[in-house]
Amino acid sequence: MMKQISILGSTGSIGRQTLEVVNSFPEELNVVALAAGRNRELFLEQCKAYKPLLVSLQLEEDALWLKEHLIKEKLRPEIRYGLDGLVAVATCHEAVVVVTALSGAIGLVPTCAAIKASKKIALANKETLVAAGQYVTKLAEEYKVEILPVDSEHSAIWQCLHGENRSAIRKIQLTASGGPFRQLNRQELENVTPEMALKHPNWSMGQKITIDSATLMNKGLEVIEAKWLFGVDYDDINVVVHPQSVIHSMVEYGDGSLLAHLGMPDMRIPIQYALSYPERWFNHLPKLNLTELKGLTFEEPDTNRFPSLSLAYQAGKIGGTAPAVLNAANEVAVHAFLAGQIKFMQIPSIVKRTLNEHQFQGSPVLEEILEIDGWAREEANKIIRNC
């Protein structure tokens, strides 16, 4: 039976790779709704190729431009824009699965709307669970909605848990490549430029997540995401640097068994599994050749050089609104770094200072989380202006 899917963030890295998976399985997958940000030219081509019923762009002017160009192609989907447009795509009646491939906390509201519409969630937008993990997981439980992880590490953990008793878990071993600056000293890190940071050694990703990988904040966000996806305490989630990115994560059980998920560093594999689950579909992607591996190495992350990882653990353990502040401040700091406004090593400093200014709240509802998100962005921007 063909699965009807909506994609939030179709012009981003994960969105484009999701469409590549769709192209490989034309009998199994069909796109019924698409949403994107500002890349209207690429979005136009996607609309022409997939002919969705409902589409949305960030700005009204881009939506009007899109409508004009689609009419020329004799295509007349429903066209929306802004946050209302994201929610419309997330709740599209025909869709069974919603791929949340947006970058940042902007994914929170449409993801919650999709859950309330009883859509299955293929989650690539980790910031949703970072900012509002307790709220979102309770909402999913209330509406009996499955959240299927798309992140390679969480997909790996999920697969290592199949058929196992969660109470038998001793530790989750979350692997990290270590990023492009794993071997740089503190002084060298001070001189890192955006161009240097955007060259990830193993993965093809968007700009924001690539910078997060370089600071190890991405791994910190994944720790918080893992806590909510799998119900494991922070003390039982361990990060290990694995530069080859062959083992995508591991689950250690109480009897001493360690189950690992191995594969090529290709995001299309976990995307495909989230869309095919509970089945596995054959594909023509490059396969891992064990005899070609020169070795698998592991090391402890250096939180002195990369303090973002420790900040994420601290915020996660505080709970409540702390992870939302962490996430929002980090988004602002990363964008400031990409714009040349701050140095690489100022990113964690700005996040820490924003966290220190916040009065934490426990068990916030969605409206409170969104309010705190806005406050944290303003506070981080204020700190940046005074740098």
Swiss-Prot record:
<feature type="binding site">
    <location>
        <position position="177"/>
    </location>
    <ligand>
        <name>1-deoxy-D-xylulose 5-phosphate</name>
    </ligand>
</feature>
<feature type="binding site">
    <location>
        <position position="11"/>
    </location>
    <ligand>
        <name>NADPH</name>
    </ligand>
</feature>
<comment type="similarity">
    <text>Belongs to the DXR family.</text>
</comment>
<feature type="binding site">
    <location>
        <position position="14"/>
    </location>
    <ligand>
        <name>NADPH</name>
    </ligand>
</feature>
<feature type="binding site">
    <location>
        <position position="219"/>
    </location>
    <ligand>
        <name>1-deoxy-D-xylulose 5-phosphate</name>
    </ligand>
</feature>
<feature type="binding site">
    <location>
        <position position="37"/>
    </location>
    <ligand>
        <name>NADPH</name>
    </ligand>
</feature>
<keyword id="KW-0479">Metal-binding</keyword>
<dbReference type="InterPro" id="IPR026877">
    <property type="entry name" value="DXPR_C"/>
</dbReference>
<dbReference type="GO" id="GO:0051484">
    <property type="term" value="P:isopentenyl diphosphate biosynthetic process, methylerythritol 4-phosphate pathway involved in terpenoid biosynthetic process"/>
</dbReference>
<feature type="binding site">
    <location>
        <position position="126"/>
    </location>
    <ligand>
        <name>1-deoxy-D-xylulose 5-phosphate</name>
    </ligand>
</feature>
<feature type="binding site">
    <location>
        <position position="125"/>
    </location>
    <ligand>
        <name>NADPH</name>
    </ligand>
</feature>
<keyword id="KW-0464">Manganese</keyword>
<dbReference type="InterPro" id="IPR013644">
    <property type="entry name" value="DXP_reductoisomerase_C"/>
</dbReference>
<dbReference type="InterPro" id="IPR036291">
    <property type="entry name" value="NAD(P)-bd_dom_sf"/>
</dbReference>
<feature type="binding site">
    <location>
        <position position="218"/>
    </location>
    <ligand>
        <name>1-deoxy-D-xylulose 5-phosphate</name>
    </ligand>
</feature>
<dbReference type="InterPro" id="IPR013512">
    <property type="entry name" value="DXP_reductoisomerase_N"/>
</dbReference>
<keyword id="KW-0521">NADP</keyword>
<comment type="function">
    <text>Catalyzes the NADPH-dependent rearrangement and reduction of 1-deoxy-D-xylulose-5-phosphate (DXP) to 2-C-methyl-D-erythritol 4-phosphate (MEP).</text>
</comment>
<feature type="binding site">
    <location>
        <position position="12"/>
    </location>
    <ligand>
        <name>NADPH</name>
    </ligand>
</feature>
<feature type="binding site">
    <location>
        <position position="153"/>
    </location>
    <ligand>
        <name>1-deoxy-D-xylulose 5-phosphate</name>
    </ligand>
</feature>
<dbReference type="Pfam" id="PF08436">
    <property type="entry name" value="DXP_redisom_C"/>
</dbReference>
<dbReference type="GO" id="GO:0030604">
    <property type="term" value="F:1-deoxy-D-xylulose-5-phosphate reductoisomerase activity"/>
</dbReference>
<dbReference type="InterPro" id="IPR003821">
    <property type="entry name" value="DXP_reductoisomerase"/>
</dbReference>
<feature type="binding site">
    <location>
        <position position="222"/>
    </location>
    <ligand>
        <name>1-deoxy-D-xylulose 5-phosphate</name>
    </ligand>
</feature>
<dbReference type="Pfam" id="PF13288">
    <property type="entry name" value="DXPR_C"/>
</dbReference>
<feature type="binding site">
    <location>
        <position position="38"/>
    </location>
    <ligand>
        <name>NADPH</name>
    </ligand>
</feature>
<feature type="binding site">
    <location>
        <position position="13"/>
    </location>
    <ligand>
        <name>NADPH</name>
    </ligand>
</feature>
<feature type="binding site">
    <location>
        <position position="206"/>
    </location>
    <ligand>
        <name>NADPH</name>
    </ligand>
</feature>
<feature type="binding site">
    <location>
        <position position="153"/>
    </location>
    <ligand>
        <name>Mn(2+)</name>
    </ligand>
</feature>
<feature type="binding site">
    <location>
        <position position="39"/>
    </location>
    <ligand>
        <name>NADPH</name>
    </ligand>
</feature>
<feature type="binding site">
    <location>
        <position position="127"/>
    </location>
    <ligand>
        <name>NADPH</name>
    </ligand>
</feature>
<comment type="pathway">
    <text>Isoprenoid biosynthesis; isopentenyl diphosphate biosynthesis via DXP pathway; isopentenyl diphosphate from 1-deoxy-D-xylulose 5-phosphate: step 1/6.</text>
</comment>
<feature type="binding site">
    <location>
        <position position="222"/>
    </location>
    <ligand>
        <name>Mn(2+)</name>
    </ligand>
</feature>
<keyword id="KW-0560">Oxidoreductase</keyword>
<feature type="binding site">
    <location>
        <position position="213"/>
    </location>
    <ligand>
        <name>1-deoxy-D-xylulose 5-phosphate</name>
    </ligand>
</feature>
<dbReference type="GO" id="GO:0030145">
    <property type="term" value="F:manganese ion binding"/>
</dbReference>
<dbReference type="GO" id="GO:0070402">
    <property type="term" value="F:NADPH binding"/>
</dbReference>
<feature type="binding site">
    <location>
        <position position="151"/>
    </location>
    <ligand>
        <name>Mn(2+)</name>
    </ligand>
</feature>
<dbReference type="InterPro" id="IPR036169">
    <property type="entry name" value="DXPR_C_sf"/>
</dbReference>
<feature type="binding site">
    <location>
        <position position="152"/>
    </location>
    <ligand>
        <name>1-deoxy-D-xylulose 5-phosphate</name>
    </ligand>
</feature>
<protein>
    <recommendedName>
        <fullName>1-deoxy-D-xylulose 5-phosphate reductoisomerase</fullName>
        <ecNumber>1.1.1.267</ecNumber>
    </recommendedName>
</protein>
<dbReference type="Pfam" id="PF02670">
    <property type="entry name" value="DXP_reductoisom"/>
</dbReference>
